[in-house]
Amino acid sequence: MGSPLRSRVSRFTRSTADPTTADPTTELVLLEIDQPFGNHNGGGLTFGPDGYLYASFGDGGSANDPEENGQDATTLLGSILRLDVDGGGAAPDCGGEDANYTVPPNEIADGPGGACDEIYAWGLRNPWRFSFDRTSGQGWIADVGQNQWEEIDVMEDGGNYGWNTYEGNACFDGPCDPEGLIFPVWEYNHSLGCSITGGYVYRGSDAAAELGGKYVYGDFCSGRLWALDVSGLEPTNEQLPVGTFGSLTSFGEDADGELYFVRTNGLVYRFFSESDTSSEGGKPESEAQLSVYPSPAARTVTVEALADASGSVRVAVYDVLGREVAVLHDGPALSSAEPLTFDAAGLPAGLYVVRMETADATLTRNVVIAR
């Protein structure tokens, strides 16, 4: 951001010295958009299943869309853009002469002039979080509302989602003509929150029983978490019984489809099954038990693991990226009368997972390391 305010999308090359970081000297500016106000400026950036880059931009901010950008397809504001950063598409339309991308065959594209060819979906207020279902490829948009309604939309090429004529399903700035508009698959009012944080359709295994195939999302203000199921004739929405997590800013998924979320407190949280167990041997869960305390912990963490299973038992600690940071036991059956401990003093603050694996079951427990 600068003065005048603008949003920038840039490409960086990985550092040759450290491939996990970007080389700041390699910046290539792909796109810059002038912003009239200091909110609703952007936020979402991801490659879709088609290999194109998708970027979301709000209506330019302030409140009530004073510049009427939501229903103006000749501006890139209030939209999700689809860009080809590998070349091979049409020339940029509304991105300016210095834009470094081409335009794929978006539905709205009509050549120079008229609607911006870069637009994939529009009529959005603040779609700062959107995602794609890793199984079906379907795009999901969480659009932050104005006075009363937060909404979830299914992304369609060329779709107009109604802002600022509509807020969710409600008429906002009439006259309100619904023709040609796409309305939310779900909405909730401000008695439950005030700023939706979009998530993902869960495709992992750790919480498949509870969340499989459902769109998991939350609210920044209330900290509530929900799972939306649209597989039936009518969508159903369930608040997850995990408490509330205020200032929830973003969700993410790993290579296995496991789901995480973060807050402004700097911690990373991961979704697990309600029972935190999976069993393949048909034996009762009582034969394997795992408890971890204290949490939060600053230094010594105690792990009580009971496993009467035949064969070896392994107990290890993992960070949120799935990297093993400590092995507490790898051998014969364990008794809870002999607790395990590990020193967390050398670990960065954050969420960790203690996992016990036997021939019959896998149990996991979370522990937060605080500083």
Regions found by a protein language model. Name each.
Residues M1, F57-D59, D143-V144, D219, ...:
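Recurrent small/Gly-Pro-centered beta-turn motifs in extracellular repeat architectures
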Residues L5-T46:
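Asp-box/WD-like beta-propeller blade repeats and closely related beta-sheet repeat scaffolds
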Residues R8, D59-E238, G257, F271, ...:
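Beta-propeller domain segments
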Residues D34-G43, Y120-W122, G246, L334-A337:
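Short glycine-/Asp-/Thr-/Trp-enriched loop segments that recur within the blades
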Residues P235-A255:
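Conserved blade-ending motifs and adjacent loop-strand segments that build the rim/top face
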Residues T249-D276:
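Blade-level signature of beta-propeller repeat domains, shared across WD40, Kelch, NHL, RCC1
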Residues F272-A288:
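Low-complexity, Pro/Thr/Ser/Gly/Ala-rich linker/spacer regions in secreted
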Residues K283-Y293, A297-R371:
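C-terminal outer-membrane/trafficking sorting elements
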